Amino acid sequence: MIYGRIPEETVLYRFTAQMPEGSKLSYNEVRSGRMHFRKVAKISHLHHAIAAKWVGGSLGTRTVMKKGKKKVDVVYNAGDKMVSEPVELWFVWKFKINNAKGHGRLKALDSGNCQSMSKGLEDGLVRCGMMGNDTNAFVTWVANLSLPMDKKQREALKFDEVELFVCKTNVKG
């Protein structure tokens, strides 16, 4: 289980955000929506490879295509490489604000709804229970994350790692 939430057997692809060696992603870098993901492990085969890149809201857009009489959910990236199987996208991350550490997960594809959750913070700076229908789900979460913070707290927010999981749709969340 990944953070006790995502069964590993459902994971098709796992990506990690690229960052310079030894550095962390800042709030502004994440908020800009220009994160690039590198594939960590190919856990099982998909008919069409997903490119390891997320630009703006391209990856995470939900579309329904007809495959014969059956409707199939597809996810596509900026290059329109299709994944013709029903999948879910999950963002998983670790972050630190000053001395407070936490981690969270976010289901970026759920019939247009975003579900997010964070835990592990003791100082009350972050409380995340956001529900929305923005396909830029992770960027939206980060934007909402900043609401209870002042500028100094936002500048102190660092993401140790951000990972993206492409999972089969039977993930329990």
Features from the language model and the residues they span:
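Catalytic phosphate/metal-binding cores of nucleic-acid and nucleotide-processing enzymes, i.e., regions
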Residues: M1-G173
